[in-house]
Amino acid sequence: MLVLTRKQGEKILIGDDIEITVLDTRGDGIRIGISAPRGIRIQRDEVRKAIEAENRSAAMRNPAAEFELIASLTALQNAEDPPPR
């Protein structure tokens, strides 16, 4: 990992297309601005981790929800079937 010290207004360049600017320093935090091509995805790590956790949670089996879905689909199918003659 490359560790750099920058002051407000100074920039860091990554490759030819990405520019990071130190906008402000406040207490123990800093504000940065990132200029990058539209095709480059930029995410905060905590947001990425929250999305991954939510996706894992959504992918887990829920037997109660499965039972409810099957019951709803069965009721719908029975409602659509014409009565026997």
UniProtKB/Swiss-Prot annotation:
Its main location: cytoplasm. One of its GO terms (cellular component) is cytosol. InterPro entries: CsrA, CsrA_sf. The keyword Cytoplasm applies. The keyword Cytoplasm applies. It is found in: Cytoplasm. It holds the Pfam family CsrA. Keywords: Bacterial flagellum biogenesis, Cytoplasm, Repressor, RNA-binding, Translation regulation. One of its GO terms (molecular function) is mRNA 5'-UTR binding. GO terms for biological process: bacterial-type flagellum organization; mRNA catabolic process; negative regulation of translational initiation; regulation of bacterial-type flagellum assembly; regulation of carbohydrate metabolic process. A translational regulator that binds mRNA to regulate translation initiation and/or mRNA stability. Usually binds in the 5'-UTR at or near the Shine-Dalgarno sequence preventing ribosome-binding, thus repressing translation. Its main target seems to be the major flagellin gene, while its function is anatagonized by FliW. Homodimer; the beta-strands of each monomer intercalate to form a hydrophobic core, while the alpha-helices form wings that extend away from the core. HAMAP family: CsrA. Belongs to the CsrA/RsmA family. This is Translational regulator CsrA. The lineage of its organism: Bacteria, Bacillati, Actinomycetota, Actinomycetes, Micrococcales. The gene is csrA.
